[in-house]
Swiss-Prot record:
GO cellular component: plasma membrane; proton-transporting ATP synthase complex
Annotated coiled-coil segments of the chain: none
Name of the protein in question: ATP synthase subunit b
Gene3D superfamilies linked: 6.10.250.1580
Keyword Zinc-finger recorded: no
Keywords: ATP synthesis, Cell inner membrane, Cell membrane, CF(0), Hydrogen ion transport, Ion transport, Membrane, Transmembrane, Transmembrane helix, Transport
Record-stated family: Belongs to the ATPase B chain family.
GO molecular function, one term: proton-transporting ATP synthase activity, rotational mechanism
Membrane topology annotation: Single-pass membrane protein
Cellular compartment(s): Cell inner membrane
Length: 156
C-alpha cells in the first residue's frame, strides 16, 4: 500500500502545485506574453505606417524634384530669351550709334570739303588777281578787286 499512498500524495502535491501555478505564476507569464505580442503588433503596424509614409515622402520628393526641374527649365528658357533680347537691343543700339557717328563724320567731311573749296577758290582768285596785276602792271583798287574775286568765286 505504500505505493498507492505515495502516488496519491504525489498526485495531491501535483494538483496543488498546478493550482498554485495557475493562480500565481501563470497569469503574470500570460500577461507578459500578451504585452509582448501587443508591442510586436504595434511595432509591425508602426513599421507599416513608416513604410507608407516613406513611400509617400519619396513620391512627394520626386514630384517636387520634377517641378523644380521644370521651373529651372522655364527660368533657363526665360534667361535665354532675355539674353537674346538684350543682345538684339545692344546690336540695334550699336547700329544706331554707328550710323550716328558715320552721319556726323560725313557731315564734318562735307563741311570741311566746302570750307576747303571756298578757301581754295579764294586763293585761286587772289593768285589770279596777283597774276593779272603783274601782267597788267597796274594796281586795281580794293573795291574792284573785291568785285572780281566775288565773280571768280561764283564762276568756280
Amino acid at each position: 500500500m505504500n505505493l498507492n499512498a505515495t502516488i496519491l500524495g504525489q498526485a495531491i502535491a501535483f494538483v496543488l502545485f498546478v493550482l498554485f501555478c495557475m493562480k500565481y505564476i501563470w497569469p503574470p507569464i500570460m500577461a507578459a506574453i500578451e504585452k509582448r505580442q501587443k508591442e510586436i503588433a504595434d511595432g509591425l503596424s508602426s513599421a507599416e505606417r513608416a513604410k507608407k509614409d516613406l513611400d509617400l515622402a519619396q513620391a512627394n520628393a520626386t514630384d517636387q524634384l520634377k517641378k523644380a526641374k521644370a521651373e529651372a527649365q522655364v527660368i533657363i528658357e526665360q534667361a535665354s530669351k532675355r539674353k537674346a533680347q538684350i543682345l538684339d537691343e545692344a546690336k540695334a543700339e550699336a547700329e544706331q550709334e554707328r550710323n550716328k557717328i558715320v552721319a556726323q563724320a560725313q557731315a564734318e567731311i562735307d563741311a570741311e570739303r566746302k570750307r576747303a573749296r571756298e578757301e581754295l577758290r579764294k586763293q585761286v582768285a587772289m593768285l589770279a588777281i596777283a597774276g593779272a596785276e603783274k601782267i597788267i602792271e597796274r594796281s586795281v583798287d580794293e573795291a574792284a578787286n573785291s568785285d572780281i574775286v566775288d565773280k571768280l568765286v561764283a564762276e568756280l
